[in-house]
């Protein structure tokens, strides 16, 4: 029976959008929200309100509802579950018909699902925990410009993680000194170097000058070592037009890879750039600057696994994922859950990793996970074990903080990486025997011995804020 508020012309959402008997279709887009309702609001009503506001609903009855098939287009909350260890919150599972979304548009999906409902008064807090994209939608998205295998073929690097470094200091260097730092790191043994997220085109270093000096450094290191090298040239800019101009110049210089800050620049810019990279044979490295503003609060926002899925659809060949062991936030199980979403063709539901739905990616190429942030040689065994071969391990301060300089720091990391990969291939337990593996390798590498001594006391032992809700 309708409530008094419904009689007064205000929607009782539960009557229309709470459908516990509904069985989701393979073509439905599924969402899991963590909901904390306002005091006095029943769970079913709060969940239905989320389904309504993120699909077809409005606050009152309108006569134009009669001009379309609301039963076909509405979002449906089909299940509610308790959140382990939190009596105030619950999970709301909502199914959305595919026709609510523009083909190939991550922008439209996010606008619908999180664009307005997060300010809704019926809920105290709201978090989008996971999405299940149907294959029918995935097939309309371009995805990564190259993918993992094509990147390995382009760079001729197989059987191990790639080794990288963010140039430090991230701001303040002249273009010439910046290029010199790139050259030393690549000559010393790194595969890739990187612009930091906030180096664009500042007065101390205009982008075109940086690109030219970096290209010279990459070409020189490639010629001297006989290995294919690269540097992520950050093309992020204030306008899409300027971004594309920078991308075109990187291509003219013969560089293999460019970089983009996908959250601060936006998904429209990112998809535009990814499509261009696909058409022009360029690799695309993605930085997640601003992600923690959105995903770190365990009760409100969007979990990073959702952002990672959206990035795979929008397009990128690398994505920063945290390190588990370094200075940045990252629960191990949860991190592995969204790393799987980046790389695998099919990811089964696994609540122990925060995966709420089976996700079939079809034939969409994978994205390399990038571990970066407060890591050094002592972390190498754990990083190789956690992230596996299809990853980029980036040591910024852990390369350039070496007492012997950038080239020595790069050499130390390269020796450590190859020692860990060799030990793993021999069946050794990297996380249990890692210290011994590194010390043995250091007997034949002065650079590694110095690095091990330099960073032997450095740890980041803060607890994770955003932990998995498991019983």
UniProtKB/Swiss-Prot annotation:
Binding residue positions for substrate: 116, 166, 170, 288, 320, 372
GO BP annotations listed: reductive pentose-phosphate cycle
Record-linked Pfam families: RuBisCO_large, RuBisCO_large_N
Coiled coil: none
Catalyzed reactions: 2 (2R)-3-phosphoglycerate + 2 H(+) = D-ribulose 1,5-bisphosphate + CO2 + H2O; D-ribulose 1,5-bisphosphate + O2 = 2-phosphoglycolate + (2R)-3-phosphoglycerate + 2 H(+)
Keywords on record: Bacterial microcompartment, Calvin cycle, Carbon dioxide fixation, Carboxysome, Lyase, Magnesium, Metal-binding, Monooxygenase, Oxidoreductase
Cofactor details (free text): Binds 1 Mg(2+) ion per subunit.
Any one Gene Ontology molecular-function term assigned to this protein's record: ribulose-bisphosphate carboxylase activity
Site (described: Transition state stabilizer): 327
Superkingdom: Bacteria
Binding site for Mg(2+): 194, 196-197
N6-carboxylysine: residues carrying this PTM: 194
SUPFAM superfamilies referenced in this protein's UniProt entry, alphabetically: RuBisCo, C-terminal domain, RuBisCO, large subunit, small (N-terminal) domain
Swiss-Prot/TrEMBL cofactor(s): Mg(2+)
Residue positions of the active site: 168 (proton acceptor), 287 (proton acceptor)
Subcellular location: Carboxysome
Its EC number(s): 4.1.1.39
Record InterPro entries: RuBisCO, RuBisCO_lsu_C, RuBisCO_lsu_C_sf, RuBisCO_lsu_fd_N, RuBisCO_lsu_N_sf, RuBisCO_lsuI
UniProt main location, coarse: other
Induction / repression: Induced by growth in low levels of dissolved inorganic carbon (at protein level).
Alphabetical list of NCBIfam families matching this protein: PRK04208.1
Subunit field text: Heterohexadecamer of 8 large chains and 8 small chains. Forms a CsoS2-CsoS1-RuBisCO complex.
Matches recorded under HAMAP family: RuBisCO_L_type1
Other observations noted: Encoded in a cso-type operon. The basic functional RuBisCO is composed of a large chain homodimer in a 'head-to-tail' conformation. In form I RuBisCO this homodimer is arranged in a barrel-like tetramer with the small subunits forming a tetrameric 'cap' on each end of the 'barrel'.
Name of this chain's protein: Ribulose bisphosphate carboxylase large chain 2
Gene that this sequence comes from: cbbL2
């Amino acid at each position: 029976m309708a409530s008094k508020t419904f009689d007064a012309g205000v929607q009782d959402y539960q009557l229309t959008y709470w459908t516990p008997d509904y069985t989701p279709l393979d073509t439905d887009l599924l969402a899991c929200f963590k909901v904390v309702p306002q005091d006095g609001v029943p769970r079913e009503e709060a969940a239905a309100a989320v389904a309504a506001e993120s699909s077809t609903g409005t606050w009152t009855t309108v006569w134009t509802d009669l001009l379309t098939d609301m039963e076909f287009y509405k979002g449906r909350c089909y299940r509610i579950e308790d959140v382990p260890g939190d009596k105030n919150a619950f999970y709301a599972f909502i199914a959305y018909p595919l026709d609510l979304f523009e083909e190939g548009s991550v922008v439209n999906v996010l606008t619908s699902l999180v664009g307005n409902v997060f300010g809704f008064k019926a809920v105290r807090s709201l978090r989008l925990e996971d999405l299940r994209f149907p294959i029918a939608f995935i097939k309309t998205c371009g995805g990564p410009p190259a993918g993992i295998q094509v990147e390995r073929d382009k760079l001729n690097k197989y059987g191990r993680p790639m080794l990288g470094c963010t140039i430090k200091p991230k701001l303040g260097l002249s273009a010439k000194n910046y290029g010199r730092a790139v050259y030393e790191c690549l000559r010393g043994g790194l595969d890739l170097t990187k612009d930091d997220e906030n180096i664009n085109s500042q007065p101390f270093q205009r982008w075109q000058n940086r690109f030219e000096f970096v290209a010279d450094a990459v070409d020189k290191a490639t010629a001297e070592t006989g290995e294919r090298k690269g540097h992520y040239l950050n093309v992020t800019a204030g306008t899409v037009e300027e971004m594309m101009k920078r991308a075109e110049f990187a291509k003219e210089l013969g560089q293999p890879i460019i970089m983009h800050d996908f959250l601060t620049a936006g998904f429209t810019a990112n998809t535009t750039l990814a499509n261009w990279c696909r058409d022009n044979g360029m690799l695309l490295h993605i930085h997640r600057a601003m992600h923690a503003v959105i995903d770190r609060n365990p009760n409100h926002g969007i979990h990073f696994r959702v952002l990672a899925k959206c990035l795979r659809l929008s397009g990128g060949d690398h994505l920063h994922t945290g390190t588990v062991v370094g200075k940045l936030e990252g629960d191990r199980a949860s991190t592995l859950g969204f790393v799987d979403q980046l790389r695998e063709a099919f990811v089964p539901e696994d609540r122990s990793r925060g995966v709420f739905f089976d996700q079939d990616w079809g034939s969409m190429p994978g994205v390399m996970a990038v571990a970066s942030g407060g890591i050094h040689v002592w972390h190498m065994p754990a990083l190789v074990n956690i992230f596996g071969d299809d990853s980029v391990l980036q040591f910024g301060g852990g390369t350039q903080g070496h007492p012997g300089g950038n080239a020595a720091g790069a050499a130390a990391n390269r020796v450590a990486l190859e020692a860990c990969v060799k030990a793993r291939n021999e069946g050794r337990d990297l996380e249990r025997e890692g210290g011994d593996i590194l010390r043995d390798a250091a007997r034949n590498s002065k650079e590694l011995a110095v690095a091990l001594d330099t960073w032997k006391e450095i740890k980041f032992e803060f607890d994770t804020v955003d932990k998995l809700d498991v019983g």
